[in-house]
């Protein structure tokens, strides 16, 4: 059954034959998912090779690819410049799918099914800064504001493993499970470690974009692996140390204001009036994270 995956707007285009390089050439200015971009395609019929260049300043992405279409399984090389970082990928195009992988396949690999559209990718990083993700002009914020994820036909699963959080020495072993389905962006079942002492598990996580406000909301479960060592890190007096096993809480994080709000906090499955009063007072202060 035919279906519309996306609508591409073309504002200006030129198609001509390059007599110097013996190539059919297309140059066009376009917009897709509210993201403007420039596209250049060169077809070398003699060598059966297509060169493609994609550039979008809004999402800070440059892509160059060379594809040989002589074989049944078409192979090529993809060079990406994303947030000032270069990535080279090999890819294979079959009838209804595309497989891609970096030279070190453990670093990046994935597949794309064309119909219906589905993207799955696995990425491994040695380190990343949360500032790159959550600052106001970060690529994540720009992508959400572009509404590129609002298409009901985009289905994506990303598994991202990050060894270290470079701007927080205590945080490590971040696993992000990002799903995009029918316009919803979820981070459910993601997790991160605080040293070796706490595991922070995101049971539910959802990005909400409404009237230029971006919020991240969900439910956290914090499991104590070595609570004594955690207390020692903050030099907490032994008289105030509680032998707790687990903390649960709902949260809302406003990415525009960098403010957290918490609710429904439980310690070892038990709520407390004193704790509720403390959380309410914290929420009312409007402290910036």
Language-model features: where?
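Membrane-proximal interfacial segments on either side of biological membranes
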Residues: 1-289
């Amino acid at each position: 059954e035919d279906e519309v995956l996306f609508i591409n707007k073309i504002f200006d285009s030129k198609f001509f034959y390059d007599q110097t390089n013996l190539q059919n050439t297309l140059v066009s200015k376009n917009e897709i998912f509210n993201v403007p971009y420039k596209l250049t395609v060169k077809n070398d019929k003699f060598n059966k090779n297509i060169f493609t260049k994609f550039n979008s300043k809004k999402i800070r992405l440059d892509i160059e690819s060379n594809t040989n279409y002589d074989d049944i399984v078409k192979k090529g090389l993809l060079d990406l410049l994303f947030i000032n970082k270069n990535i080279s990928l090999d890819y294979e195009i079959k009838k209804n799918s595309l497989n891609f992988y970096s030279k070190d396949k453990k670093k990046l690999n994935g597949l794309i099914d064309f119909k219906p559209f589905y993207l799955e990718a696995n990425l491994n990083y040695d380190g990343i800064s949360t500032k790159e993700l959550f600052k106001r002009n970060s690529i994540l914020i720009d992508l959400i504001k572009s509404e590129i994820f609002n298409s009901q036909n985009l289905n994506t699963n990303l598994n991202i493993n990050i060894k270290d959080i470079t701007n927080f020495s205590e945080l490590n072993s971040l696993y992000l499970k990002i799903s995009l389905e029918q316009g919803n962006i979820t981070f459910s079942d993601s997790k991160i470690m605080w040293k070796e002492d706490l595991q922070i598990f995101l049971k539910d996580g959802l990005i909400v974009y409404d009237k230029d406000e971006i919020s991240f909301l969900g439910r956290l479960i914090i499991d104590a692996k070595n609570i004594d060592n955690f207390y020692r890190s903050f030099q907490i007096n032994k008289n105030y140390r509680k032998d707790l096993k687990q903390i649960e809480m709902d949260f809302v994080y406003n990415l525009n204001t960098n403010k957290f709000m918490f609710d429904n906090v439980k310690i070892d499955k038990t709520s407390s009036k004193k704790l509720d009063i403390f959380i309410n007072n914290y929420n009312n202060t409007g402290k910036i994270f």
